[in-house]
């Protein structure tokens, strides 16, 4: 399936990049993963670090970015089937995913860290302390993959990290592995203040994010990579990063 659609009044599609009308870029994203992608409850708009990145890429490359909200484990199948053109959703580059889709160069190393209750925190000094434990995870996440490799663990999966945090807070599991920036950001939010959770500082493993496209779509892949390179070179990437993570310590 073609990866771009040019909107025309008669509904006719064209691949001409030189045309006046913007090309629609259908971007799949899990929009409940602040601060990377989420829905602003005040105006209903999709916001976050990834959303700012892809919209800036769209501005530079002439795309009309259309965000399509979906589950994390639905992103790769949607790319394979051609229902979306790109996946931009704090998506970890893994060998399993790379067999089915193509990734840009990594644009962020989030790093997996441990979220647990304040009572359990002193008991966890390394990954070994998670062995033979009941753990929580977001379904389809890199954290879930890593936890399943820890000897003796049972991993309960949830539709979102927020749901997993709630279960962890209730004592439904011992701990969870999740992207470090998300753990830290969550603990700065009002919703977490009445919860008994804390994030540990040590990084369990690297967690490199990439934007994904349908296998073999070299044209779009190059445009995304080129735009990210340009944004790093001119300081735009750093400005967007500081906007979302500058106050997250």
List each model region and its residues.
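A ligand-binding cleft/hinge motif common to bilobed small-molecule-binding domains
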Residues: 74, 89-99, 146-149, 174-205
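Periplasmic-binding protein-like
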Residues: 31, 109-116, 180, 184-225, ...
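Extracytoplasmic small-molecule ligand-binding "clamshell" domains
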Residues: 22-91, 99, 234
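Extended ligand-binding regions for polar small-molecule ligands
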Residues: 51-60, 118-121, 128, 133-134, ...
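Short helix-initiation/N-cap motifs at beta->coil->alpha
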Residues: 51, 67-77, 122, 156-170
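Ligand-binding cleft/hinge of the Venus flytrap
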Residues: 37-40, 54-61, 127, 140-161, ...
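A conserved helix-loop-strand patch within extracytoplasmic ligand-binding domains
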Residues: 63, 91-93, 105-155
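Sec/Tat signal peptide C-region and signal peptidase I cleavage site
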Residues: 15-21
């Amino acid at each position: 399936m073609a990866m771009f659609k040019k909107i025309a009044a008669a509904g006719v599609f064209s691949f001409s990049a030189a045309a006046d009308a913007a090309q629609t870029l259908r971007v799949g994203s899990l929009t409940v993963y602040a601060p990377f992608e989420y829905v602003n409850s005040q105006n209903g708009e999709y916001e976050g670090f990834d959303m700012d990145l892809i919209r800036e890429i769209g501005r530079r490359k002439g795309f009309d970015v259309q965000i399509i909200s979906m589950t994390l484990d639905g992103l790769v199948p949607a790319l394979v089937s051609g229902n979306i053109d790109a996946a931009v959703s704090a998506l970890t580059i893994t060998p399993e995913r790379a067999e089915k889709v193509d990734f840009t160069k990594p644009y962020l190393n989030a790093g997996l860290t441990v979220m647990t209750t304040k009572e359990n925190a002193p008991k966890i000094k390394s990954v070994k302390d998670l062995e033979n434990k009941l753990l929580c995870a977001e379904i389809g996440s890199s954290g879930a993959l890593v936890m399943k490799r820890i000897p003796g663990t049972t991993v309960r999966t949830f539709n979102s990290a927020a749901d997993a945090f709630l279960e962890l807070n209730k004592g439904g599991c011992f701990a969870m592995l999740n992207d470090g920036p998300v753990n830290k950001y969550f603990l700065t939010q009002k919703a977490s203040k009445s919860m008994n959770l804390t994030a540990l500082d040590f990084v369990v493993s690297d967690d490199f994010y990439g934007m994904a496209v349908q296998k073999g779509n070299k044209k779009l892949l190059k445009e995304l990579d080129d735009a990210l390179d340009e944004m790093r070179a001119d300081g735009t990437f750093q400005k967007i990063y500081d906007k979302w993570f500058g106050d997250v310590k």
